[in-house]
Amino acid sequence: MLKNLLIVLSVSYLFVACTGKDAKKQESAFIVMKTKSIKFADMGFIYSSSTGVKVEVYAAGQPLLDLDINSQNICLSLLKCMDKEQFNEEVLSASYPSTLLENIFKSEAIFEEKNLEKVEGGFKQNISKEGVYDISYSVISGKRIFRDKINKILIKIRKQ
């Protein structure tokens, strides 16, 4: 009887211990972000999962920026949360799609894969709309570079 109870508890523990967690991919990276309102270039960590992205940036070992991107909004250093469209308007450009920043941190194509060109080790995209944005974006061998010449935005992520 005790043996059967022990077996049931052991099997139950295995099922409970192996469920309910969202798998996360973690990477350390050198992150550069220059926009009209945010400027930094430091080491950090990027945590990706199916539910969103979390970015932590450190300067001299101290937390500098905490960016949490989920399906509805973007939270900046636990102080200010805003929906993705509002974040784009205030920090990036109102003309960008709401998924842009998340796609960059996840190494995914932007603007629904518009002008996607596969290259060795990744892909490139050149997207422009006269007077609104002039974007070059590449994800090649663990290095992501997003540059918008019109809005003067640069996001570089170099995997460490």
How should each PLM-predicted stretch be described?
Residues 37-39, 60-62, 79-80, 128-132, ...:
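Glycine-centered tight beta-turn/hairpin loop motif at sheet-sheet or coil-to-beta transitions
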Residues 2-9:
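Sec-dependent signal peptide recognition
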Residues 14-17:
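C-terminal motif of bacterial Sec signal peptides marking the signal peptidase cleavage site
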Residues 26-49:
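Post-signal peptide N-terminal segment of mature Sec-exported envelope proteins
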Residues 51-99:
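An acidic-aromatic
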